[in-house]
Design a protein with these regions (language model features):
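Beta->alpha loop/short-helix hinge microenvironment recognizer with preference
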Residues: 1-307
Length: 307
């Protein structure tokens, strides 16, 4: 069911999103700040909006209406808590009068500065309101705003990693990447190498060394690492902004389609057969003996016996 939902989402986005250049951006933050968002999970709800508003603000100054979709991620390859945002933005948008399509570019350095300031301000303002829970690792050192700033100020002086991928001529690459990236579980079954009832061993890619490494932990630690990434019920992992927001897309997307000479198509229906053909190269309704088409005849339900 999860695979079908993922492919259905990808198919829908590929048909709805405008055919234009896209820029994929990954917003990260220093590891020293991750625990603040683990201890204050309600703040995760604001991160996508902060990331999107940075680009919306830049575009607004140029009188251009852009489209954005984002995805929140909380885990690294080794299942540790690692908060970051994946964002795709159109490299063009509607002019102020909504009559023409204008090109726009974003600068990595200024984007990083605005993201860094916004996150630091978020933590400071939340603390001033008395709503910030201090992570366990900082409880012995943070007792007032001044001591909090002793933690935040050095991080503000650092260069934060905001990655700009190579621009894509179409949204398909970003949609396929984000769809499978967000909809999949934190750890693919293929990466699990060993389990003996007490110990779990899995493989992961170390981004620093660029090599695959093995991670060994107890069963309890593995479960703890895994369940920390379960989002709150109804939490929106993927969000839309600008002309892709649900508030504006109904009015603006038809205009954009006309300007880009694009004819939107009805998303392809994802079925059990299409998934089997795509990933298993097998038609489930073809007889393995004679090659004839199988015909559905009846469905039998398992009987429940009373005890």
């Amino acid at each position: 069911m999860r695979k079908k939902a993922t492919e259905q989402w990808i198919a829908k986005q590929n048909e709805i999103l405008p055919q234009c250049d896209y820029q994929h951006i990954t917003y990260t933050m220093p590891a020293a700040l991750w625990s603040f968002f683990k201890a204050n999970r309600f703040l995760l709800n604001t991160l996508s909006t902060i990331a999107a508003k940075i680009l919306l603000k830049i575009a607004k100054k140029k009188k251009i209406k852009i489209g954005i979709f984002t995805a929140l991620h909380t885990f690294g390859r080794d299942l540790k808590w690692n908060v970051h945002i994946h964002l795709s933005v159109t490299r063009g948008g509607l002019s102020g009068n909504e009559l023409t399509w204008k090109t726009i570019y974003f600068k990595k350095q200024s984007t990083m500065h605005m993201w860094r300031l916004a996150i630091i301000q978020l933590l400071r303002q939340t603390y001033k309101k008395g709503k910030l829970t201090i992570p366990e690792e900082y409880q012995s050192t943070i007792h007032h705003l001044t001591s909090l700033n002793r933690i935040l100020n050095p991080e503000y002086q650092k260069k934060w990693h905001v990655h700009f991928a190579q621009p894509q001529k179409s949204h398909h690459h970003n949609v396929n990447y984000l769809g499978r990236y967000i909809k999949r579980p934190p750890l693919a079954q293929s990466r699990l190498l060993h389990y003996d009832g007490k110990t779990v061993v899995f493989r992961y890619l170390n981004h620093k060394t660029k090599h695959h490494e093995l991670f060994r932990c107890t069963t309890i630690e593995f479960i703890q690492r895994l369940i920390q990434h379960i989002p709150k019920k109804s939490f929106k992992m993927i969000r839309y902004y600008g002309f892709l927001s649900f508030r504006l897309r109904g009015r603006l997307l038809p205009r954009i389609y006309r300007l880009l000479d694009q004819m939107p198509k009805t998303p392809k229906q994802i079925t059990f057969t299409s998934l089997s053909l795509q990933f298993l190269r097998t038609d489930p309704f073809e007889c393995i003996l004679c090659g004839s088409r199988l015909v559905f005849k009846e469905r039998r339900h398992k009987r429940k016996f009373r005890t």
